[in-house]
């Protein structure tokens, strides 16, 4: 059985491999997802300038509730999409951070899509 430490090493290797071909621009920034055991974080990043354009997390006061982790991820996806559309961002590149497209990562992505982001 693969241990948690080994699982994270594999994820980091996968993320580094994907990031070589994945980059955000001012016209089409990158939506980065980080998932911890308790929270989920999303950032929209312009890699050319090295600037975070918008961010949302399950720790934000308007999102943090006593809900399941998947429900919180859905709220984070809706919040990041709203912040992006307020700044005029419609298209993004989705960076799942080496995580499988399943569960919380999938819930965040689908909520962002339904809220108006295109990827």
From Swiss-Prot:
Keyword Ribosomal protein assigned:
yes
- Classify the source by domain of life: Bacteria
Question: Which GO terms are recorded in the biological process aspect for this UniProt protein?
Answer: translation
UniProt keywords, alphabetically: Ribonucleoprotein, Ribosomal protein, RNA-binding, rRNA-binding
Q: Which GO terms describe its molecular function?
A: 5S rRNA binding; structural constituent of ribosome
Summary of subunit composition and partner proteins = Part of the 50S ribosomal subunit; part of the 5S rRNA/L5/L18/L25 subcomplex. Contacts the 5S and 23S rRNAs.
Family, per entry = Belongs to the universal ribosomal protein uL18 family.
Could you identify this protein by its name? Large ribosomal subunit protein uL18
């Amino acid at each position: 059985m693969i241990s948690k430490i080994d699982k994270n090493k594999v994820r980091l290797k996968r993320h580094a491999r994907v990031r070589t071909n994945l980059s955000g621009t001012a016209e089409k920034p990158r939506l980065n997802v980080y998932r911890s055991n308790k929270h989920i974080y999303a950032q929209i990043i312009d890699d050319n300038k090295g600037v975070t354009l918008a961010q949302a997390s399950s720790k934000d006061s308007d999102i943090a509730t006593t809900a399941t982790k998947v429900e919180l991820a859905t709220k984070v996806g809706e919040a990041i999409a709203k912040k992006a559309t307020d700044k005029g961002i419609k298209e993004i590149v989705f960076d799942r951070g080496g995580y499988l497209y399943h569960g919380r990562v999938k819930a965040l992505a689908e909520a962002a899509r339904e809220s108006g982001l295109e990827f």
